[in-house]
């Protein structure tokens, strides 16, 4: 990597996300049974939907945690908690990436018995998840297709008046 380049870019397509989420679902299939899936918003919503469909799980909730501002980490802020999950026993918590692990650690404080899974994990975040598919280097910046600045992003249509 050149001195001018501070990170490696890893752009992902919708097809790659789907394939990787299905691979994660296969790894999780024998670890259940699951009461439901909790998607960490917003990055975990697409993978959680794919995984829930693959595992035939109908109960899906969200855990809204804010941990990124621009491209730098900051302290986690819990915006919305899932209801009726107790200590998390039997629940599957999904996010797209475990970067530093802070988001998963915050979630684990609320639901210590849940199973935590991500498609991708960086070295600092690997210990925060129970299951993941792919390890990526610390200096890799993953570009998800649902992010507005990505070429595969499709903006919502304007409402018809």
Residue ranges and their predicted role:
Residues 1-161:
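PRPP-associated nucleotide enzymes
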């Amino acid at each position: 990597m050149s001195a001018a380049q501070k990170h490696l870019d890893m752009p992902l397509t919708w097809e790659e996300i789907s394939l990787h989420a299905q691979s994660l679902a296969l790894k999780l299939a024998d670890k259940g049974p699951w009461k439901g899936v909790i998607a960490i918003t917003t990055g975990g919503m697409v993978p959680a939907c794919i995984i829930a469909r693959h595992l035939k799980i109908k109960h899906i909730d969200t855990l809204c945690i804010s941990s990124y501002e621009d491209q730098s980490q900051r302290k986690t802020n819990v915006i919305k908690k899932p209801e009726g999950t107790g200590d998390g026993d039997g629940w599957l918590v999904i996010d797209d990436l475990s970067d530093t692990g802070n988001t998963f650690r915050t979630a684990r404080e609320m639901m210590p018995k849940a199973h935590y899974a991500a498609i991708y994990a960086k070295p600092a975040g690997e210990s925060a998840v129970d299951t993941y598919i792919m390890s990526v280097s610390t200096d890799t910046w993953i570009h998800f297709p649902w992010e507005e600045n990505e070429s595969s992003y499709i903006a919502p249509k304007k409402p018809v008046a």
